[in-house]
C-alpha cells in the first residue's frame, strides 16, 4: 500500500476517534443533566417547592436543551458521513440510540412538570404546597447540572405563572420537533442496534455470583446444623452414661 494512502487512513482514524470521544462526552453530559432534572421534578409540590426550585428547573431545562442541540448536531453530522466503516457506524448508532432515549425521557419529564405546575401552582407567599415538617435544599443538585459547562444565567426567578407555563409549552414543542427532525434526518432502527455486551452474559454472571452466595450460605447453614446435631448426640451419650452409672451404683 502506498505511503500516502496509509497516511490518509491514519488521519481518518484519528478524526473519527476524536469525533466519537466528543459525541460520548456530549451524551454523558446530557445524561447527567436529565438525571438532575428528573430529581428536581420529584420535589414539585412538596416541602422543598419554592420559587427558587421553579427557577432551578427552568435553568436546568435550558441547559439540557442546549446539550441536546449539541448532541444532535454532532451525531447527525457523524452518521451522515458516507466514509464510515461498518464498525464505526455501529458505534455511532449505539450513541444515537442512547441520545434519543435520553431525549424522550427528558420530554416526558417536561410534560410532567407542566402538569404538576398546572395542578400545583406556586403561591405568591412562597409557602410550600404540602406542609410535611421536613425541608431540603435543591441548589446543590441543580448546580451539578449547570456546571457541566460554564454558562451564565440570570438569577432572577420567573414571577408569573402564566409566563412559566408558556415557556414550558414552547420548550416541550421544541424538543418534540427535535425528535421528529432527528428521525427524518437519520434513519436508525433501534431494534437493529446491538448492545456492546450481551444480556445473557450479564444474566449468567449475575446468576453465577448469586449461586456462589447461596452455596456459601447453605454450607454455613449445614455446618451449623452439624454442630447442633453433634452437640445433641454428645448430651444424649453423657445422659445415658450417667443413668448407667447411677443404676450400677444402686444395684
UniProtKB/Swiss-Prot annotation:
Alphabetically list the UniProt keywords: Coiled coil, Membrane, Signal transduction inhibitor, Transmembrane, Transmembrane helix
Report the principal subcellular site.
membrane
- Where is the protein situated, by its record's location annotation? Membrane
Q: Name one GO biological process term.
A: G protein-coupled receptor signaling pathway
Residue ranges the record marks as coiled coil: 53-94, 158-187
Any ranges marked Cytoplasmic in the topology annotation, and which? 1-230
Instruction: Look up the record and report any one GO term of the cellular component aspect.
Output: membrane
Q: Which membrane topology term applies here?
A: Single-pass type IV membrane protein
- The answer to keyword Coiled coil applying to this record is yes
Kindly report every residue range on the membrane side named Extracellular.
Answer: 251
Query: Which parts of the chain span the membrane according to its record?
Result: 231-250
Family membership noted in the UniProt record: Belongs to the RGS7BP/RGS9BP family.
Q: Which PANTHER family does UniProt cross-reference here?
A: R-SEVEN BINDING PROTEIN (R7BP) HOMOLOG
Q: What does this protein do?
A: Regulator of G protein-coupled receptor (GPCR) signaling. Probably acts by regulating the activity of some 'R7' family protein (RGS6, RGS7, RGS9 and/or RGS11).
Q: What is this protein called?
A: Regulator of G-protein signaling 9-binding protein C
- Organism, by scientific name, is Xenopus laevis
Q: Organism classification, top ranks?
A: Eukaryota, Metazoa, Chordata, Craniata, Vertebrata
- Record gene name: rgs9bp-c
